[in-house]
């Protein structure tokens, strides 16, 4: 099998692909550098940052609407906001939009509830532009890696979940980008790689995202050997789309891939925005709660995390979307979301 044949969706009518129309409340983030295998050059990273900021900034106040730090203590502030939230209340706080439907509507009314990060061509992203890196000054190299980290952080803290269709090879920082999103999708034969060790530049930064999606030992093997793996062995990290057997055309695999992407985006775009945002913040926050022998319940942190998450569930239950969802369920009708 040639290398071209081995790339998933490689040369499968993806090169000239026109991105499908998105449902309402969804928007694209476009990684646009196909001539350079979608390498993350300084200019491309600046463009990704700009697109993210546009989709995360309140049109009304000009405020950047990102999730708060993943720190358990912030739940105290959210509880105070939730307890005093009322239709006629004028009291607000920095994060009131996470629990108050009125504040959400005021700040995020024109912003998307789901983002879709896509590139075109047979390679999703080959990572940093090594040719450019070699020509940059040390200060510019530091700027490139700092900008890369900022882009990943904006994705992680986006209230709108970020879906990432990985239509081709994802390596190094390109894999980091894909796995920093909330929901990545790939065909079973899609190749992933941390190739830096082969050129004396271990993929230390990309490994931070990968090791948070798959077991650390598996990540370290990829980091150490630089060997490529397929999505089929990374099912914990990616929604893997099986390629149809006995397909008469490679377009069949592309259709299965696009069908799954559309299904996921439609489902998320049809969901209430505020619960998804609060749920995302709570999920990543509780993962960082470890057992504390002195001021917690010790052990692996499960009991502390469960107790803390119960407080977030109470916030969910007080919210307008939860009340609407429960009412719709009991009345056997579709909910009319507030956010």
What residue spans do the PLM features occupy?
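CoA-thioester-processing core
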Residues: 151, 155, 165, 171-223, ...
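Structural motif
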Residues: 118, 158, 165-166
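A short acidic, glycine-rich active-site loop
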Residues: 137-146
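Conserved CoA-thioester-binding segment of acyl-CoA-metabolizing enzymes
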Residues: 1-118
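Catalytic-core regions built around general acid/base machinery
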Residues: 51, 103-107, 147-159
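C-terminal long alpha-helix characteristic of the crotonase
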Residues: 185-190, 238-308, 314-320, 337-339
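Acidic, divalent-metal-coordinating active-site segment for phosphoryl/phosphodiester hydrolysis
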Residues: 226-233
């Amino acid at each position: 099998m040639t290398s071209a044949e081995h790339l998933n969706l490689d040369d499968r009518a993806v090169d000239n692909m026109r991105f499908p129309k998105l449902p309402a409340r969804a928007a694209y983030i476009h990684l646009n550098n196909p001539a350079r295998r979608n390498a993350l050059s300084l200019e491309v990273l600046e463009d990704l940052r700009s697109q993210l900021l546009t989709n995360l900034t309140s049109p009304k106040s000009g405020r950047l609407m990102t999730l708060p730090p993943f720190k358990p203590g912030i739940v105290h502030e959210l509880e105070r906001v939730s307890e005093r939230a009322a239709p006629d209340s004028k009291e607000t706080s920095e994060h009131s939009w996470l629990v108050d439907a009125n504040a959400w509507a005021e700040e995020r009314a024109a912003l998307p509830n789901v983002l879709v990060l896509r590139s075109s061509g047979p390679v999703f992203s080959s990572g940093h532009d090594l040719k450019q890196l070699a020509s940059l000054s040390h200060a510019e190299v530091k700027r490139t890696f700092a900008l890369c980290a900022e882009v990943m952080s904006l994705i992680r803290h986006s209230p709108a979940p970020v879906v990432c269709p990985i239509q081709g090879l994802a390596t190094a920082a390109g894999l980091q980008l894909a796995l920093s999103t909330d929901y990545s999708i790939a065909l079973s034969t899609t190749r992933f790689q941390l190739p830096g060790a082969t050129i004396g530049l271990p993929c230390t930064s990309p490994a931070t995202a990968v090791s948070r999606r798959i077991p650390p030992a598996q990540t370290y093997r990829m980091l150490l050997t630089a060997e490529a793996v397929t999505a089929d062995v990374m099912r914990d990290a990616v929604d893997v789309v099986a390629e149809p057997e006995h397909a008469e055309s490679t377009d069949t695999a592309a259709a299965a891939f696009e069908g799954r992407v559309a299904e996921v985006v439609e489902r998320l775009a049809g969901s209430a925005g505020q619960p998804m945002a609060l749920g995302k913040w709570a999920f990543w926050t509780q993962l960082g709660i470890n057992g504390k022998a002195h001021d917690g319940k010790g052990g692996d942190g499960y009991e502390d995390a469960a107790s803390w998450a119960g407080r977030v569930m109470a916030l969910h239950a007080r919210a307008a979307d939860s009340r609407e969802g429960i009412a719709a369920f009991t009345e056997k009708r579709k909910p009319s979301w507030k956010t």
